[in-house]
Amino acid sequence: MSDPAQEVEAPVEAAPVASSPKGKKEKAPKAPKAEKPKSDKPKKPKAAPTHPPVSEMVVNAITTLKERGGSSLIAIKKFVAAQYKVDVEKLVPFIKKFLKASVAKGTLLQAKGKGASGSFKLPPAAKKVDKPKKAPATPKPKSTKPKRVTGEKKVVKKPAAKKPEAKKATKAAKPAAKKVAAKPAAKKAAAPKPKAAAKPKKEVKPKKEAKPKKAAAKPAKKPAAKPAKKPAAKKAK
């Protein structure tokens, strides 16, 4: 029999443990971030400018300064800043653009320099760029005339409704007018009688026949005078 001490139990191998890298921890997957809902707030409207247009401010500066050699860009900037109380540095590019365009059009004269630098002045007959205000429309006097015409038309229309009655009156008067017309026809027939009585008066003209008697009396006087003169001449011898 073998001794129990001699029998050595074989060691039991342990299961291999999975080795994990030191310092590295497995990260859990991140949940996707919820998108923030966009707020539908209305955009604020841009504030209206409290100053007039750049063109008006520049022209006003040049006309007010009245410099003989023209107003420079620096002088225009100072005037605009003092008069209108605006941030001139923001308006400088617009002022330069207006000056160049005005010189090209001829609304401004460049006394010195080139481009936006130099001095500028208005031409002698140039007018301000200010837009003329529209005059209020004056009421036209013609509006009173149509009222009178409409009144006259109404007056004319009223007797037009009574025309049928006038026609009846004229129809009734026609037979009476025929009777009256028959009476002057009888008078016309009687009128020729006095004309026939007047004809014999024209035929009586006995005065014209007395003229030949005077002509017969003249030759009777002449032969009686001639024989009396001849014997008187013989006695004178």
Curated annotation (Swiss-Prot):
<feature type="region of interest" description="Disordered">
    <location>
        <begin position="1"/>
        <end position="56"/>
    </location>
</feature>
<feature type="region of interest" description="Disordered">
    <location>
        <begin position="109"/>
        <end position="237"/>
    </location>
</feature>
<dbReference type="Pfam" id="PF00538">
    <property type="entry name" value="Linker_histone"/>
</dbReference>
<dbReference type="InterPro" id="IPR005818">
    <property type="entry name" value="Histone_H1/H5_H15"/>
</dbReference>
<keyword id="KW-0238">DNA-binding</keyword>
<comment type="similarity">
    <text>Belongs to the histone H1/H5 family.</text>
</comment>
<protein>
    <recommendedName>
        <fullName>Histone H1E</fullName>
    </recommendedName>
</protein>
<dbReference type="GO" id="GO:0045910">
    <property type="term" value="P:negative regulation of DNA recombination"/>
</dbReference>
<dbReference type="InterPro" id="IPR036390">
    <property type="entry name" value="WH_DNA-bd_sf"/>
</dbReference>
<dbReference type="InterPro" id="IPR036388">
    <property type="entry name" value="WH-like_DNA-bd_sf"/>
</dbReference>
<dbReference type="GO" id="GO:0000786">
    <property type="term" value="C:nucleosome"/>
</dbReference>
<dbReference type="GO" id="GO:0003690">
    <property type="term" value="F:double-stranded DNA binding"/>
</dbReference>
<feature type="domain" description="H15">
    <location>
        <begin position="50"/>
        <end position="124"/>
    </location>
</feature>
<dbReference type="GO" id="GO:0005634">
    <property type="term" value="C:nucleus"/>
</dbReference>
<keyword id="KW-0158">Chromosome</keyword>
<feature type="compositionally biased region" description="Basic and acidic residues">
    <location>
        <begin position="200"/>
        <end position="209"/>
    </location>
</feature>
<feature type="compositionally biased region" description="Basic and acidic residues">
    <location>
        <begin position="26"/>
        <end position="42"/>
    </location>
</feature>
<dbReference type="InterPro" id="IPR005819">
    <property type="entry name" value="H1/H5"/>
</dbReference>
<comment type="function">
    <text>Histones H1 are necessary for the condensation of nucleosome chains into higher-order structures.</text>
</comment>
<dbReference type="GO" id="GO:0030527">
    <property type="term" value="F:structural constituent of chromatin"/>
</dbReference>
<feature type="compositionally biased region" description="Low complexity">
    <location>
        <begin position="1"/>
        <end position="21"/>
    </location>
</feature>
<dbReference type="GO" id="GO:0031492">
    <property type="term" value="F:nucleosomal DNA binding"/>
</dbReference>
<feature type="compositionally biased region" description="Low complexity">
    <location>
        <begin position="182"/>
        <end position="195"/>
    </location>
</feature>
<feature type="compositionally biased region" description="Basic residues">
    <location>
        <begin position="210"/>
        <end position="237"/>
    </location>
</feature>
<dbReference type="GO" id="GO:0030261">
    <property type="term" value="P:chromosome condensation"/>
</dbReference>
<dbReference type="GO" id="GO:0006334">
    <property type="term" value="P:nucleosome assembly"/>
</dbReference>
<keyword id="KW-0539">Nucleus</keyword>
